[in-house]
Amino acid sequence: FKQKTAYEISACLVGSEMCIRDRSWVTYGLGSENQNLPGFISMCPGYPIQESQNWQSGFLPGIYQGTHINTRHTSVDKLIEHVKNRSLSLGEQRRQLDFIQQLNHEHAAKRQKDAQLEARIQSFELAYRMQMEATDAFDVDREPESVRERYGKTTQSRQLLMARRLIERGVRFVQVWHGKWQPWDNHDEIEKNHRKLADECSQGIGALIADLKERGLFEDTLIVIGGEFGRTPTVEITNAGKSKLGRDHNSAGFSMVLAGGGVKGGTIYGATDEFGFQAAENPVHVHDLHATILHLMGFDHERLTYRYASRDFRLTDVHGRVIRDIIS
């Protein structure tokens, strides 16, 4: 499970020019426990900046890309309105799909290996199977009122409750964006805005952790909360020399939260300098974070590879170390 700050992660703002998606790598490595639901689901009330680029699979096969659920709708029928076919029965759909798939396979046989075509063939089958289970999975109204009250009434709380329901049903990777576009990118009025945003998600995060513990899922679920950079410790000054009480981007020192899934609880690892500007003690690179996440999911990050352009690629490229001090 990963919560994002809804900024342009696909633009590689922390300096890497190789844009790869960690969640697609997890799905590639683990597969899916539930063949009726996608292995990677991305929820956002609308779209984050750069839209669908954020859950594409990079150079991995398209079957590992995420499925976007627009959570600005509260009705389950609206949430998954494009999954159900209201004109054809399941039997009629199956006959229609079998014919389309026959044509697709004949087309594929005349071409060299085409990952995009193979992904499309598989996506049609997944869309058909999703009709069996998607309605139940996304319908939080089936939860007792006490559970819904526990999570809270915000959009973010509702997304987190959906995330728990998806995890229960075997979805490997659930990504939860906090707000559409980039609400955390506050170059002005940062204190007021961040307090509001924190209030929208804090109750739901606490409820999710407690709920997973009570259901025996906490130790099997890795929760990662954070973004791709922090904010400067100093107020940002505009070109006109005025302050709007905001902060600029800062990739030199910021924090993330990991919980569950083999993480040692109550641990603080690393520290910034006295100004809160850059990591000064036990700095962690994004490759180290990825290596640690993969380790907690049962992978050796140096051995999980995908061959592309005549090279065996890793999520961590040629870098990365497992941060063993935070592992229980």
Where are these regions (language model features)?
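Short, exposed "boundary/linker" segments that immediately precede the start
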Residues: 1-9
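Ligand-binding pockets and gating/stacking loops
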Residues: 11, 16-17, 21-328
